Amino acid sequence: MNKANIFCTDTNMKVILFSEVSVGISANSILFISHLCMFLGESRPKPIDLYIAFFSLTHLMLLVTMGLIAVDMFMPGGRWDSTTCTFLMYLHIVLRGPTLCATCLLNVLWTITLSPRNSCLTKFKHKSPHHISGAFLFLCVLYMSLSSELLSITASLNLTSENFLYVSQSCSILPMSYSIKSMFSTKMAIREAFLIGLMVLSSGYMVALLWSHKKQAQHLHSNSLSLKASPEQRATRTIMLLMSFFVVFYILDSVIFYSRMKFKDDSIFVCVQIIVSHSYVTVSPFVFICTEKHIIKFFWSLCGRIVNI
């Protein structure tokens, strides 16, 4: 079977991919709308609400782009020209950068929010939402500018090439030259190592804070221990669960990617990698939705208002 045609013939992959994209778009939309409304509706808005809205928006954009590509994978008859193919593939690859930036900065921001008053991070607690949105946009633009080599990728309607990087019904994108590929891989490895290292440091700091807070609470309430977790503990567990999902899916994505490079004739790795690489952005909003009860209450009240109109 031609590798280019596996997307059209494998019904299981089609169902899994479209289900993943649909669920991810729905969950991220709920998270985005709820936190944006909470940020705009409060008299003293919390910066963390705005940033979680940014976090879900980047995931939403990535999944929408993937949905457009998936439609072209499975629907017969190519409809894209070379320009459309290049633009969507470039946009999809580049959007993975802001997703990583959003996860990293969310981790750092949560660490700052939960830090004690005597911490050196206290001075960053009262920064306005403009500083947060500005920092996020700056990192996104910087990340995208460092990916300028991707603009040189070639979109082609030739689906018979054995060296394709990505294939849909309309186009295949051929590999970059060795020099461009080496430069891009080096810069990508450096920035991903920096962002992941920052996440590891902030996660370790939060674990230390959680342990210290737990010991202090046990010492103060040794005679009447409460089984109810504090808001700080719940927030720390949420972000640690989020980081755990990120690490697991990142490792799986890397393993499948290198397996795909090794077994070039086994095109099933292409489909599996697409599904795994979008699993984190699909699962992550459920971490917030399931742990933050006010999101569920917000949507129940919103549905009640709509019914009463």
Curated annotation (Swiss-Prot):
Annotated TM spans: 21-41, 51-71, 86-106, 135-155, 193-213, 238-258, 268-288
PROSITE patterns in the record: G_PROTEIN_RECEP_F1_2 (PS50262)
Family as reported in the entry's similarity comment: Belongs to the G-protein coupled receptor 1 family.
Function in brief: Putative pheromone receptor implicated in the regulation of social and reproductive behavior.
Membrane topology reported for the UniProt record: Multi-pass membrane protein
Cytoplasmic face of the membrane: 42-50, 107-134, 214-237, 289-309
GO molecular function: pheromone receptor activity
Keyword Glycoprotein: yes
InterPro entries given in the database record: GPCR_Rhodpsn_7TM (IPR017452), Vmron_rcpt_1 (IPR004072)
Name of this chain's protein: Vomeronasal type-1 receptor 46
BP GO terms, sorted: response to pheromone; sensory perception of chemical stimulus
Gene: Vmn1r46
